[in-house]
Amino acid sequence: MRHSKRTYCPDWDDKDWDYGKWRSSSSHKRRKRSHSSAQENKRCKYNHSKMCDSHYLESRSINEKDYHSRRYIDEYRNDYTQGCEPGHRQRDHESRYQNHSSKSSGRSGRSSYKSKHRIHHSTSHRRSHGKSHRRKRTRSVEDDEEGHLICQSGDVLSARYEIVDTLGEGAFGKVVECIDHKAGGRHVAVKIVKNVDRYCEAARSEIQVLEHLNTTDPNSTFRCVQMLEWFEHHGHICIVFELLGLSTYDFIKENGFLPFRLDHIRKMAYQICKSVNFLHSNKLTHTDLKPENILFVQSDYTEAYNPKIKRDERTLINPDIKVVDFGSATYDDEHHSTLVSTRHYRAPEVILALGWSQPCDVWSIGCILIEYYLGFTVFPTHDSKEHLAMMERILGPLPKHMIQKTRKRKYFHHDRLDWDEHSSAGRYVSRRCKPLKEFMLSQDVEHERLFDLIQKMLEYDPAKRITLREALKHPFFDLLKKSI
C-alpha cells in the first residue's frame, strides 16, 4: 500500500545517474544545466543575490566559467541551416548531470557518402566518477566512503546478475549493465542505490510507482520503462530495468545538436503523449519530463554526409521511445512540492507557485517537442524572472489573473512583469528569443500543425492548456494514424 505522503529527497531530483543518463553518447564533459526541483530552490538562497545586470554582459562567451553559464540557443534559424558549430547549441547541465562522459557510438572521423549504408549500434560506456558530498552514515565493508557499493566487472548480484559494465555513477548511486543468468543471458540495467537512509527511502517511493505502472500495464503498451524486479544487496536497494538505448537528448548531442526529422518527431510525440496520458489517467504527474528522460528503445542509426551543413548526419532507424525516471512522480492525493521540473521545462504555474497538477507535464512536453524540432531549448536560463521574460517574448504577456494570484510579487510591478527590455539582460532575451511561430523552419502544413500543437501545450493558464487526451486527437497526428 502506497504512502499518502511521499518521502522527498533533494538529491532525488538532482541525481546524475537517472535512467535517462545511463545511455550516454559523448565523451565530452557536459556543461551545467538548470537545477531540478529542491536543489535549485536551495541554491537560489545563496546565489540569487549575486545576480546583477553586469552578469548579462553581451561580451560573455559560452566558455565562461560563471555559475550562471547558460545553454545557448541559435540566434535565428540561419545559424542552424548554415551548420553552426555544435558548441553554440550546447546544453548547460546542472549538478545532476556533471562529470558525465562516455564513449562515442562508433562514428567515423571522416565523412563519406558510403556511410549512408552503414548501420551504427549505440554502446554504453563508463561514466567518470565525480565528487559528491560526504554524508555521515554507517558503512559496510563493501561501500566506499560516499556510500557507493564497491563492485567491478565479473561480480554477481543476488546470485543472478553478473556485472559487465558500469553505465553511470553519481550522487544517488550507480548503474551497472548486467547479464541475467536466470533469464537466458539477457542484458539488463541495475540501479544500485547508495546505502544511505534518505536515498533508500526515495528509491522505495519510485519502486511503488513502478510496481503500480507495471501491474497496470504489464506489456508496456503505454511505453513506461519496465522494472523487472528489485532486491537488497548488503544494505543497497537494487532496481532491475530493461536495458534501453540512448536518451533523446544524448542522440541530439551526439548528432551535433541537429534536430530530428519531422516524421520522427510525430511518432515520438505521439508515444510520449500516450505514455504520459497513461500516467495522468492513473492519477500521477511525472513532474520531470525532459529529453533526458525519454529513451529510445534502440538508438541504432544510419549516417550520411549532408552537403548543406558540410558534415555527417545521423538518422534514427527506429524512433520508438519509452518514458523513464519516476523518482519525482506524484499521485494526486500526495503532498505536492512547491518546486518541480527541470528549469527549461518548468511550467509558469510552478514558477509562480500557483500550485500544479497534470498540466505541468503538458507544458514540459511542449518544450520537449520544440527542442526536438530545433535541436536546442528556447528557454536557456537559470533565473525565474528571466524565464518569465522569455515566455512573454515567445508567447505574449502573462495573464493578469495569474499575476494577481501569485505570491511571487518580486517579479512584478503594477501587475506587469518587472523587466527592463533595455538592460543587458533585456537585450539578451530580445536577441535570443522571438515569437513562437518565427521558429518555424517551413510554412508547410505539417510544420504549421506541429506548432499549433506546441502552442496549445504552451498555454499559460493550466486550466486552458490542452490535455493529453485532446492532444492525441490533434491533426498533427493524422498522418501517423493513416499509416497504422
From Swiss-Prot:
Regulates splicing of its own pre-mRNA according to its kinase activity; increased expression of the catalytically active form influences splicing to generate the catalytically inactive splicing variant lacking the kinase domain. Leucettine L41 inhibits its kinase activity and affects the regulation of alternative splicing mediated by phosphorylation of SR proteins. Residues 26-35, 113-138 have a biased composition (Basic residues). Residues 100-112 have a biased composition (Low complexity). One of its GO terms (molecular function) is protein tyrosine kinase activity. InterPro entries: CLK_kinases (IPR051175), Kinase-like_dom_sf (IPR011009), Prot_kinase_dom (IPR000719), Protein_kinase_ATP_BS (IPR017441), Ser/Thr_kinase_AS (IPR008271). The modification Phosphoserine is found at S61, S140. Autophosphorylates on all three types of residues. Pfam families: Pkinase. Keywords: ATP-binding, Kinase, Nucleotide-binding, Nucleus, Phosphoprotein, Serine/threonine-protein kinase, Transferase, Tyrosine-protein kinase. It comes from the Eukaryota. ATP binds at L167, G168, E169, G170, A171, F172, G173, K174, V175, K191. Belongs to the protein kinase superfamily. CMGC Ser/Thr protein kinase family. Lammer subfamily. This is Dual specificity protein kinase CLK1. It comes from Homo sapiens.
